[in-house]
Amino acid sequence: MLLELAQWFAGDIRLLNVFSYITLRTVLAALTALIISFIVGPAMIRKLTAYKIGQAVRDDGPQTHLVKAGTPTMGGALILVSIAITTLLWADLSNRYVWIVLITTLGFGMIGWVDDYRKVVYRNPKGLSARAKLFWQSAIAILVALYLVLTAELPAQTTLIVPFFKQVAVPLGVTGFVALTYFVIVGTSNAVNLTDGLDGLAIMPTVMISSALAIFSYVAGHAVFAKYLGMPHIPQAGELAVFCGALAGAGLAFLWFNAYPAEVFMGDVGALALGAALGIVTVIVRQEIVMLIMGGVFVVETLSVMLQVASFKLIGKRIFRMAPLHHHYELKGWKENQVVVRFWIITMMLVLFGLSSLKLR
């Protein structure tokens, strides 16, 4: 919106031409989302508390978590509102990728909102059934995947890029692309949701990864940089850096309220949406394998749940004291802050390793 206004008046005020730079708008998007979240956050927390939109805590979980019962949840709505407003303000609204990412993010956010609403307002601990949740996640992911593959103009837009190797790409075809896109979006969405079990645990890795994806998006959308770094050039993908900047800014502000001891939880409305956002951006800029590296904490948390369930069903024994993995370490004696910060450190190292793929080819 502001970009269009700047372009309209650029002939009279040449200084406005600076808004054509994606890098500047990415920084401004991050700052805008940060400020919106900081301003709106306290009021939202007061409203959630007044309406008793509180988190239920599982009885079989770590006993230290019982004090969290009643903490306001559904705070992820704050993140989504900040991202949406900021993206509409600073991104190029004629760019189709901007709308694809926004629609996907808000679509998954709506699924999470219904789930949270049923849990909190209707006092239904199960919320939206797993089958219904997966159905709607699948519907959105498949529709988005079909749109992307059927409107692709370049082979690079539908190939699997292998990082750390020059010009190594695997053609996926329509079926392969749709399948991979489905698993990346739905998988990342649910992985972030599973990880969101401790104060600040999920949001900081999300901020780190979205910041890295902003760099990948900018490079992918820049023909010269993409060629120099051996990355596929995806026309118009650079504009996603603005969205990623907004996500990082909103997420960082949310961490202010979500840090231990948390004043608010993001709930499924935030976790499912943010995971889907990371997933769809990853797909568009063709960095699925790099995302697997950078999101290593999310991957391991998800695998811990899968292994725990499989082990118990097959041999009647549990591999971990409790799943997801962060609860296992809590029961081993780690303090909540220790688990969170150590997982942050691991994510930071993985993100830096993922970013190194830009040059190490």
From Swiss-Prot:
Cofactor: Mg(2+)
Gene Ontology CC entries for this record: plasma membrane
Pfam families: Glycos_transf_4, MraY_sig1
Main localization (coarse): membrane
GO biological process: cell division; cell wall organization; peptidoglycan biosynthetic process; regulation of cell shape
Annotated CDD domains: GT_MraY
Superkingdom in the source lineage: Bacteria
Localization per record: Cell inner membrane
Entry keyword set: Cell cycle, Cell division, Cell inner membrane, Cell membrane, Cell shape, Cell wall biogenesis/degradation, Magnesium, Membrane, Metal-binding, Peptidoglycan synthesis, Transferase, Transmembrane, Transmembrane helix
Reactions this protein catalyses: UDP-N-acetyl-alpha-D-muramoyl-L-alanyl-gamma-D-glutamyl-meso-2,6-diaminopimeloyl-D-alanyl-D-alanine + di-trans,octa-cis-undecaprenyl phosphate = di-trans,octa-cis-undecaprenyl diphospho-N-acetyl-alpha-D-muramoyl-L-alanyl-D-glutamyl-meso-2,6-diaminopimeloyl-D-alanyl-D-alanine + UMP
Tagged with keyword Transmembrane: yes
Family statement drawn from the similarity comment of this UniProt entry: Belongs to the glycosyltransferase 4 family. MraY subfamily.
Main function: Catalyzes the initial step of the lipid cycle reactions in the biosynthesis of the cell wall peptidoglycan: transfers peptidoglycan precursor phospho-MurNAc-pentapeptide from UDP-MurNAc-pentapeptide onto the lipid carrier undecaprenyl phosphate, yielding undecaprenyl-pyrophosphoryl-MurNAc-pentapeptide, known as lipid I.
Name the UniProt record assigns to this protein: Phospho-N-acetylmuramoyl-pentapeptide-transferase
Species of origin: Nitrosospira multiformis (strain ATCC 25196 / NCIMB 11849 / C 71)
Lineage summary: Bacteria, Pseudomonadati, Pseudomonadota, Betaproteobacteria, Nitrosomonadales
